[in-house]
Amino acid sequence: MRGKLSRRALGLGAAALAGTGGWTGRGHAQTAPLKIGGLLPRSGFLALIGQACQRGRDLALPILKDMGYSVELMNADFESKPDVARTQAERLIREGANILLGAFESGATLAIAQVAEQHGVPFVIDIGSEPSITEQGFKFIFRNFPTSVILANNGLSRFSDIFQASGKTPKTAVLMHVNDTFGQSMLHAIDAYAATGKLPFKILDKISYDPQAKDLSIEVAKAKAAGAELHMVVTRLNDAILMVREMVKQRYDPMGIISPGSPGMYDLQFLKVLGKYADYCITNVPWLDPKQELNSRLARDFHKAYPDQSYDLNAGFSFEGMLICADAYRRAGSTKPEALAEALRQTKLEKRVMIGGAIHFDVKGQNPDQISAAVQNLGGKPVPVLPAANAEGKLVFPMPGFDQRG
């Protein structure tokens, strides 16, 4: 299949060069490219998503070159294991990485953050939502992705928009969620939001499960037995597929399947494997901005390079991570950690790929201004349906029953 990443391309320490020097910032010329140590789970149970993120980084190289940036990408696979992420981060630093970038999985991202802070090396988090990472007073950590609290709050507030737009509001819901670091942090955020009384429905039951589970029949049966009108989920990719397959098998037809902000249901593999049963699932997540010229360029390059793959937030945030690193280097004019960190603190990128305002970081190193769109699978593709300003399709809610789809 075209677009599939070879082992050679993904080899540890593989480097790709984008651009040459020549720009002067703060009176210092860029005499060498910035070495970005990129960490992702390109093997193990998160491999498909890790490889999707890698595509966004790889495509950033020629685009950044055209923009006049000078960067080199050093790749490392942490095999979907946080302990391996730690050792890989240490290896990249030993081999000369000036800045680290990663890492999708929250446990691994936290491990890398600890290594980066210990060594005084800047770490840009392109995807990773564990709240504690930016609550520990770290000086070298900068996150462009929303925390699970921001993600959940944005996603849960979008539920009311969905119900208002459709004219249908469920009174009850059941929650199925993964029990890993990400799933637990999302659960805490959902509980906190529910305690405010802002949820338009009552959660009747909360069902946790291992994201590496091979069978979810018991969990789905329990969810069905709750008798809730809405099925709310916090998933990864493989478990999301298992869950919907089991819902079809057990003839469990809620009004809708909605995530307040998790991967899985908008991923290409989910759409391919489940076919018509993947349609009408909704995920409330940060999404690509159709009005940004940089997004148009990235989308065009992506579809040309990977015609069989899905262009989604994994590629978008991964690209933005590369852009953030390159922009900081150009303004710092130096690869010294302190200079890069100071430049990162002053980041203000109006031209970006994702919806939301300019990329910037607060005193904790967090971009606080990300927003979420309601992204619904329609006709085998993830399509933003809300807010209206970013919509590219029309919301369908409640969803048709599984046995009513042609």
PLM regions and their residue ranges:
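Extracytosolic ligand-binding ectodomains
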Residues: R2-G13, W23-G25, A29-G406
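Alpha-helical DNA-recognition elements
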Residues: A16
